[in-house]
Design a protein with these regions (language model features):
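Edge strands and adjacent loops of beta-rich recognition modules
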Residues: 385-387
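Active-site helical microenvironments for divalent-metal-assisted chemistry
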Residues: 1-4, 8-259, 263-314, 320-383, ...
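Conserved structured catalytic cores and adjacent interaction surfaces
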Residues: 390
Length: 396
């Protein structure tokens, strides 16, 4: 079933290479099992599915299927190159080398050196880190089968390194899940208490959100602006971070959800904003224009916080469909490959410049050159990502 999902979600019309990689990986991992007792092949299959869901090219999906064969079986880089080409072999080699990084949560020098190595791997081919993120995400999804000590170690490593890198790459789909899974194992009591509290309020909140969505949708429609309007709950780690940083209870956190408006053009974004500000009173100082001033990870949207019908503040985010894709998939949305019908099925890069793909990376590489001190490098990186504050990470 997983193999069918991987093929179904792949954007490639040429699935023969993916099928071949599956059979090679299955045979190479024959007799190996995960801690869960499942056949080992389930893991690379799930990694490949995550990559296919990001709509990456077939070479990346193939490398995802093969990412553990060099480290865990007798298969060599040379054999991979011979069977699947140099491009796939280089991707697998890059992921293998990243898997050999040491980690020590208490040593800044070790963390900084690991991040430097990751950035160098990204500079060679960003797809290496995308495979590694997919690998880490599936490992976090199955972390319950590890010992409690290993759970905390992997969760800490994920929160300290992998979630921030997903944030830097703008891949919110992966970043959010890594954050929530890390919190689940680092602070289980707080996590399950939060899940319970939110579940208790779910029916009332859902009714309120649906009413707001319908009101907004109707007003936007009346203004002649084609739009998709929906409501979404904020993820657990985001809520927990606010509760800790602001010393508040769940009932004191007002933005547990956001209304999202997706339109066709930038012009429609600002037109929709005008409609919204006529409907509800905006809270001064709570408007952010990330369209005019995008975040370093390419995120663009208009954010505004308003007073709702019951007097409760709520947030609305407005973006185009293209901006929404970038918000969900980040750098992966700019690393897509299309299959050309007139070139024998060879993948060709889409018309996205290297400048667009790697603008975020150049800044970090410049920091690396400028930072002679590892502690200074980590301090600057952490402050930029805004995900490493002492308040958030003083877990026991």
């Amino acid at each position: 079933r997983q193999r069918q999902m991987c093929i179904r979600d792949s954007p490639s019309t040429d699935i023969s290479l993916i099928e071949k990689a599956y059979h090679v990986a299955r045979d190479a991992h024959e007799g190996q099992a995960r801690k869960s007792g499942e056949p080992y092949i389930i893991h690379p299959l799930c990694v490949a599915i995550i990559l296919a869901e990001l709509e990456l090219d077939k070479e990346t999906i193939v490398a995802g299927l093969l990412h553990d064969v060099v480290e865990d079986t007798v298969m060599t880089d040379e054999q991979i190159a011979q069977e699947f080409g140099d491009e796939v072999a280089l991707l697998v080699d890059g992921v293998t080398k990243l898997g050999q990084l040491s980690y020590d949560a208490d040593k800044v020098e070790v963390q900084a050196e690991n991040l430097r190595k990751m950035f160098l791997a990204m500079a060679k081919d960003i797809r290496v880190i995308l495979i590694k993120l997919a690998d880490r995400l599936h490992n976090m999804r199955t972390l319950k089968y590890m010992t409690p000590e290993k759970q905390k170690e992997k969760a800490r490593e994920t929160m300290d390194i992998y979630a921030p890198i997903a944030q830097r790459l703008g891949i919110s789909k992966i970043k959010i899940e890594l954050d929530d899974l890390s919190l689940k194992y680092l602070e289980p009591d707080a996590y399950y208490d939060l899940v319970h509290q939110i579940a208790q309020r779910k029916s009332v909140r859902d009714e309120y959100v649906q009413k707001l969505v319908e009101e907004v949708r109707q007003h936007i429609k009346d203004a002649g602006i084609p739009a998709q309007v929906d409501g979404r709950a904020k993820h657990f780690f985001s809520i927990y971070k606010k509760m800790v940083n602001q010393h508040k209870t769940l009932d004191q956190i007002y933005d547990l959800f956001a209304i999202r408006i997706i339109v066709d053009s930038v012009k429609d974004c600002y037109a929709a904003l005008g409609v919204i500000h006529e409907m509800y009173k905006p809270i001064p100082g709570r408007f952010k224009d990330y369209i005019a001033m995008p975040k370093p990870n390419m995120y663009q949207s208009l954010h505004t916080t308003l007073i709702g019908p019951t007097g409760q503040p709520f947030e609305i985010q407005i973006r185009t469909f293209e901006m929404h894709r970038t918000a969900e998939y980040g750098i992966a949305a700019h690393w897509k490959y299309k299959e050309a019908s007139n070139n024998g099925g060879v993948s060709q890069p889409m018309t996205v410049t290297e400048e667009e793909k790697l603008s975020w990376l150049r800044q970090i590489l410049e920091w690396q050159r400028d930072m002679s001190d590892n502690k200074e490098f980590m301090s600057l990186l952490k402050s930029d990502l805004d995900l490493f504050s002492d308040t958030v990470f003083c877990f026991t």
